[in-house]
A protein has these predicted regions:
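Residue-level recognition of oxygen-bearing side chains
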Residues: 70, 90, 191, 204, ...
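GST-like fold's C-terminal all-alpha helical module
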Residues: 104-201
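A local structural micro-motif
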Residues: 30, 159, 207-208
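Terminal-tail/helix-coil boundary detector
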Residues: 208-216
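GST-like domain detector, emphasizing the conserved glutathione-binding G-site
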Residues: 1-134, 155
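Positions that flank functional sites
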Residues: 36-37, 162, 214-215
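Active-site-flanking alpha-helical
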Residues: 18, 76, 172-173, 209
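Phosphate-coordinating loops and pocket residues in cytosolic domains that bind phosphorylated ligands
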Residues: 48, 201, 210
Length: 216
């Protein structure tokens, strides 16, 4: 069996979500870096595998796939190792709920609204849009309240074990926590902060650290 190939960027949160699934399952894989944010735009060869120009994309023994949620579920079901999707109905529904919250409500404000303004923009000499930051923080705080309520007293979002929900949420919340506003927001939600600290210590997370974390 040939090793799967993941096309993306190590610094991309969605690429990292897929990498975390591969790491948690103990799957050998190749990460092929595809720069989609450069001045040249999305490479033509990547558009051939992902017509919307997003990352990641995935290939395994002639089977190609894009959309992170589809990729991580395939990884969990195609390879042996620890199950990352609960079998119990309500736990699985909770996992799906958290993934949807991250995609629909958390990703854009936390990453493009706050993280990009506070971490990426200064490195590139770009002024931050403070109105966008303020609006994004309001939305991010709502997400944190909702996620902490879902977490409750559990160790992980769907119960006692790590699932795809945790892997989906972690890269976004980790980047958000690197900003002052994100740190303060998470400090106001101690159960969510404790979840993030514990999840961030997992070997899979340490093995996939990106340049923004390594620089700090």
């Amino acid at each position: 069996m040939s090793d799967p190939v993941l096309y993306g960027l190590a610094r991309s949160v969605y690429t990292r979500i897929a990498r975390l699934a591969l790491e948690e399952k103990g799957v050998r894989y190749t990460l092929e870096e595809v720069e989609i944010f450069g001045s040249a735009g999305v490479p033509a060869e990547h558009l051939a595998r992902q017509p919307f120009g997003r990352i990641p994309a995935f290939a395994h023994e002639g089977f190609t796939l894009y959309e992170t949620d589809a990729i991580t579920r395939y990884i969990d079901e195609a390879f042996p190792g620890t199950r990352l999707q609960p079998q119990e109905l309500r736990a699985r529904a909770r996992m799906n709920q958290v993934i949807a919250i991250i995609d629909s409500y958390a990703y854009r404000p936390m990453i493009w609204g706050v993280f990009a303004a506070r971490i990426v923009a200064p490195e590139e000499g770009i002024a931050s849009n403070e109105m966008l930051v303020a609006e994004s923080l309001t939305r991010s705080r709502t997400c944190c309240r909702a996620l902490e309520e879902i977490l409750g007293t559990n160790c992980y979002f769907a119960g006692a074990e790590v699932t795809l929900a945790d892997l989906h949420a972690l890269p976004i919340l980790l980047y958000f926590s690197m900003t002052q506003e994100g740190h303060e927001t998470l400090s106001a939600h101690p159960r969510l902060r404790a979840w993030l600290d514990a999840a961030a210590a997992r070997p899979s997370v340490q093995r996939t650290r990106a340049k923004f974390e390594l620089a700090r």
